Amino acid sequence: GDGAHSLNISTAVALVVAACEVPVAKHGNRAASSKAGAADTLEALGLNLDRASAQAEASLTDLGICFLFAQKHHPALAPLAPIRKAIGRRTVFNLTGPLANPAGVTRQLIGVARPDFLPVYAEAIAALEYQAVMLVSGDEPLDELSVCGPSTCLTVGRPAERLAPEDFGLTRHAPEDLRGGDPAYNADALRRLLMGETGAYRDAVLLNAGAALVVAGHAHDVRDGIEEAAEALDRGLAKALLDCWIAY
């Protein structure tokens, strides 16, 4: 919901983190302010959205990952989908969506579309029953940790930090290197990533997966998390997980 029309970074991050044996409940929807949302891209990869959502609990138990299709879990909002699509830009639903995961998660990496929204999210998080949350916003703006420039990272109870890809040994990339397309385009890029393709997409996924592994208590710091995420990609664990998920 940041309007950057980038590749599906958080969807790829979910697969990589789950391949690191951290259970992930991915909550997403079809595109409203972009060309391809998480649901669109996963469907283009071959995931049956209705079945995946209906079997979410079993999938999370058996595979360590599930997809919670927002249209199925928040049916009262379904009639608004065409209106949001017609508006074509961020609405209040882009802001509240990350806080409405039906799985009731207690640890979460939350991407925020604009840095000035971070304090508002922090107030909301403080009122909810989370164990650990990291709020991140790229300067582009981008609702992820950015590999195209600096990002702001806010953990409740701690001062905000400024982070850059170079801080973690990653290359800085141009925003157009992460530009996405329609669901088929984004799905193809994600599959190539899982098959070992390097570049901006991989670096963006590694950085955000590294942060997610810290939030999960699975990595000591982001650098350690990046190393673990890279291993999950290089050993084909994330690709194998996607294949199992599609066949489940």
Residue positions per predicted region:
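Glycine-rich anion-binding loops and their surrounding alpha/beta cores
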Residues: 6, 43-50, 58-248
